[in-house]
Swiss-Prot record:
<comment type="function">
    <text>Divisome component that associates with the complex late in its assembly, after the Z-ring is formed, and is dependent on DivIC and PBP2B for its recruitment to the divisome. Together with EzrA, is a key component of the system that regulates PBP1 localization during cell cycle progression. Its main role could be the removal of PBP1 from the cell pole after pole maturation is completed. Also contributes to the recruitment of PBP1 to the division complex. Not essential for septum formation.</text>
</comment>
<keyword id="KW-0133">Cell shape</keyword>
<keyword id="KW-0175">Coiled coil</keyword>
<feature type="compositionally biased region" description="Basic and acidic residues">
    <location>
        <begin position="117"/>
        <end position="131"/>
    </location>
</feature>
<dbReference type="Pfam" id="PF05103">
    <property type="entry name" value="DivIVA"/>
</dbReference>
<keyword id="KW-0963">Cytoplasm</keyword>
<dbReference type="InterPro" id="IPR011229">
    <property type="entry name" value="Cell_cycle_GpsB"/>
</dbReference>
<comment type="similarity">
    <text>Belongs to the GpsB family.</text>
</comment>
<feature type="coiled-coil region">
    <location>
        <begin position="39"/>
        <end position="76"/>
    </location>
</feature>
<keyword id="KW-0131">Cell cycle</keyword>
<dbReference type="GO" id="GO:0051301">
    <property type="term" value="P:cell division"/>
</dbReference>
<dbReference type="InterPro" id="IPR019933">
    <property type="entry name" value="DivIVA_domain"/>
</dbReference>
<dbReference type="InterPro" id="IPR007793">
    <property type="entry name" value="DivIVA_fam"/>
</dbReference>
<dbReference type="GO" id="GO:0005737">
    <property type="term" value="C:cytoplasm"/>
</dbReference>
<comment type="subunit">
    <text>Forms polymers through the coiled coil domains. Interacts with PBP1, MreC and EzrA.</text>
</comment>
<protein>
    <recommendedName>
        <fullName>Cell cycle protein GpsB</fullName>
    </recommendedName>
</protein>
<keyword id="KW-0132">Cell division</keyword>
């Protein structure tokens, strides 16, 4: 959504136009004081509506900015979380293989000189170093 998009509508009279409007007196016309009092009430309402519209436009702009900010944060967070498991999985596999290799050396270390173990283990641990 575009935060700069505003609904345009035609306003015929502003509060100042209503205040400054002078009516002609006719013989059988309305009481000018009553008309003025009524129009003063309309002016107050009109100004209140105008202030509320301005406040809502400002709030709308702030909310669109906040949505944009949160969308960017979410995008960054998704990118980081998508990369993190791959990195952690590779590191975890490497750590497991390293610990397994150390455990094998500890358990079978004294037997590595035996010929029976040498027949099954060629001493090549290059697959451990690959990870």
């Amino acid at each position: 959504m575009d935060s700069n998009k505003e609904t345009k509508f035609s306003i015929q009279y502003g509060p100042k136009d209503i205040l400054d409007k002078k009516f002609k007196n006719k013989v059988r016309g309305y009481d000018p004081d009553e008309v003025d009092e009524f129009l003063d009430g309309i002016i107050r309402d009109y100004e209140a509506f105008t202030n509320e519209i301005d406040r809502l436009k400002e709030e709308n702009t702030k909310l669109f900015s906040r949505v944009d900010e949160l969308t960017k944060q979410l995008s960054v967070s998704k990118n980081v979380s998508a990369q993190t498991p791959q990195t952690n999985a590779a590191a975890t596999n490497y750590d497991i293989l390293k610990r397994l290799s150390n455990l094998e050396r500890h358990v079978f270390g004294s037997k590595l000189s035996d010929s029976s173990v040498d027949n099954h283990d060629d001493g090549n641990h290059s697959d451990v170093d690959q990870y």
